[in-house]
């Protein structure tokens, strides 16, 4: 559901609360800085009036001194405003990145299955980076424009009430009406541009990962053509945004010129009617002409906000997204796992029934085998045991406690889950295995690798355990990746081991070694082994079959 721009800004503003005192400092420095710049022009006009022999009650030397002081102050105030404003921006960007990563952890595993990697990369990098525009160049300028304009209207009030009306109309038109109109007209362009960039990132990432297949099947030219087509769409969307920015500048310049002319004629009329003297006339006109800086900054914001609000909406949507299941924190901790009982479990993905009335029991010291064809629901049952999902009906108990009554962290700490695909990080082999237990020694890692029948292979590499992995483990075969995943499970040393097709990519020799390792640790573990291989099922104490979601 699309959020209103003001709603997005409101949510983004809430994040500033811890740094409100620094934001107040930024606004103060910015307001004083603009006033210093404006009054340099006003004092210059006052000096001109003095030269024309009109009495302004100020000496020429006093005006010159004030001009020098204001010029120096303007530089210092501008520096302090920019420094504090960008401190807030980058502090909040770091906070947002932390929140986004925490949100991704919270949404894993279930919700992230439906999200494209390229879109997430675009969000974590480009979208968050674009929010710097909002925090450093939007919040403070809005408040600075408000306070500066309010102070200047008080100054205009000392000259003429008509000047106040003209200045108020000018500030509202340039700083409020024009930005609102242009933002509404072009907001969809900014959102569409961010979506196209995210889609392009995803498409390009997909192309890089599938480069071998693209070359093998002669699909390179078509893929390149599609990249060019997508790039053209991005260019078109970007051109629309730039066209909008140009229109905003034109509208702003026209509005400024019109109100300058109105102020000039208003001053001339008042002067001709002896309502104001020449000094008030000249100061009033120059004051308005030199005071557009803060409100023009607001007008220019509208074009930048088109992309910023679209990025903010994407980030906020991710932060607000709820996980499939919330982690349980104030419940039972698992200790001395002795048995798992699955009782009359039914589960469906949407309308598609996956498991129907499944029941089983397995005790510590046993290996339970689950056999069945691909798509029969075997892997889904393991995900239910990990509590990635809850069953639609029935229950799953560990030591007599249902999973919703067990602390999620404790549940996961007591389980080692080996999936069909092992993800390899761009780190050394040692660090890839250590992922299972961060405080593990090299000796413990090597022992786990021996159990997983991968130790000898690692030692055969030039750098051994310090061998750096390429992206996605491109320098390993599928079987080698799988054995590293199994080594992680052995290192984790959890009392419950869940294995989903652990030997599917292994030859018979390595399969036998892995199965022997499982038998060696069987007495202290509760093992559930999913496989379609009859040879793997041979080590199991009991085997159940699942066919079309039902026990057979």
UniProtKB/Swiss-Prot annotation:
Domain ABC transmembrane type-1: 23-307
Sample GO molecular function, one term: ATP hydrolysis activity
Residues that bind ATP: 372-379
Keywords: ATP-binding, Cell inner membrane, Cell membrane, Membrane, Nucleotide-binding, Transmembrane, Transmembrane helix, Transport
Membrane topology category: Multi-pass membrane protein
Subcellular location: Cell inner membrane
Listed transmembrane segments: 22-42, 52-72, 139-159, 162-182, 253-273, 278-298
Gene Ontology CC terms: plasma membrane
PROSITE patterns from the UniProt entry: ABC_TM1F, ABC_TRANSPORTER_2
Residue intervals of the ABC transporter domain: 340-552
Major site of localization recorded for this protein: membrane
SMART domains in alphabetical order: AAA
InterPro entries found in the cross-reference section: AAA+_ATPase, ABC1_TM_dom, ABC1_TM_sf, ABC_CydC/D, ABC_transporter-like_ATP-bd, P-loop_NTPase, Type_1_exporter
Annotated GO biological process: cell redox homeostasis; glutathione transmembrane transport
Family assignment from sequence similarity: Belongs to the ABC transporter superfamily. Lipid exporter (TC 3.A.1.106) family.
Protein's UniProt name: Probable ABC transporter ATP-binding/permease protein HI_0664
């Amino acid at each position: 559901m699309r959020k209103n721009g003001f709603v997005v800004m409101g949510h983004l503003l809430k994040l500033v609360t811890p740094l409100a005192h620094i934001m107040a400092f930024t606004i103060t420095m910015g307001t004083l800085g603009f006033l210093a710049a404006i009054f340099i022009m006003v004092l210059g006009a006052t000096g001109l009036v003095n030269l024309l022999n009109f009495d302004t009650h100020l000496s020429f030397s006093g005006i010159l001194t004030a001009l020098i002081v204001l010029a120096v102050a303007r530089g210092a105030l501008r520096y302090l405003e920019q420094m504090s404003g960008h401190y807030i921006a980058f502090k909040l960007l770091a906070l947002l990145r932390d929140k986004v990563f925490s949100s991704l952890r919270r949404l894993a595993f279930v919700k992230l299955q439906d999200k494209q990697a390229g879109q997430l990369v675009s969000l974590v990098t480009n979208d968050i980076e674009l929010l710097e525009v909002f925090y450093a160049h939007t919040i403070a300028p809005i408040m600075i424009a408000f306070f500066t304009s309010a102070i200047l209207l008080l100054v205009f009030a000392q000259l003429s009430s008509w000047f106040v009306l003209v200045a108020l109309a000018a500030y509202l038109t340039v700083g409020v009406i024009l930005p609102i109109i242009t933002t509404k007209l072009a907001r969809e362009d900014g959102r569409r541009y961010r979506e196209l960039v995210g889609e392009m990132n995803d498409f390009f990432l997909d192309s890089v990962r599938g480069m071998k297949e693209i070359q093998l099947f002669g699909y390179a030219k078509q893929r390149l053509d599609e990249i060019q087509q997508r790039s053209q769409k991005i260019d078109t969307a970007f051109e629309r945004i730039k066209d909008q920015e140009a229109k905003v500048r034109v509208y702003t310049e026209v509005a400024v010129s019109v109100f300058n002319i109105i102020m000039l004629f208003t001053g001339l009329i008042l002067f001709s009617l002896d309502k104001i003297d020449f000094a008030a006339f000249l100061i009033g006109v120059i004051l308005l002409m030199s005071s557009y800086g803060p409100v023009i900054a607001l007008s220019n914001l509208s074009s930048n906000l088109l992309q910023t609000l679209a990025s903010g909406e994407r980030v906020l949507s991710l932060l607000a997204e709820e996980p499939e299941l919330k982690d349980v924190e104030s419940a039972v901790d698992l200790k001395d796992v002795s048995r798992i009982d699955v009782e009359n479990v039914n589960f469906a993905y949407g309308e598609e029934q996956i498991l129907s009335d499944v029941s089983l029991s397995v005790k510590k010291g046993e290996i339970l085998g689950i056999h069945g064809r691909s798509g029969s629901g075997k892997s889904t049952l393991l995900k239910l045991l990990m509590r990635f999902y809850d069953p639609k009906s029935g229950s799953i108990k560990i030591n007599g406690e249902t999973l919703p009554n067990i602390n999620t962290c404790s549940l996961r700490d007591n389980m080692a889950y080996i999936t069909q695909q092992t993800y390899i990080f761009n780190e050394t082999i040692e660090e890839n295995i250590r992922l299972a237990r961060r405080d593990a020694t090299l000796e413990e890692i090597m022992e786990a690798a021996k159990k997983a029948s991968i130790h000898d292979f690692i030692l055969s590499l030039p750098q051994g355990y310090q061998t750096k992995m390429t992206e996605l483990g491109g320098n390993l075969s599928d079987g080698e990746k799988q054995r590293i995943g199994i080594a992680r499970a052995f290192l984790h040393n959890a009392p419950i081991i869940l294995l989903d097709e652990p030997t599917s990519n292994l030859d018979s020799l390595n399969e036998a070694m892995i199965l022997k390792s499982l038998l060696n640790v069987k007495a202290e573990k509760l093992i559930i082994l999913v496989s379609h291989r009859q040879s793997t099922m041979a080590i199991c104490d009991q085997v159940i079959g699942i066919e079309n979601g039902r026990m057979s």
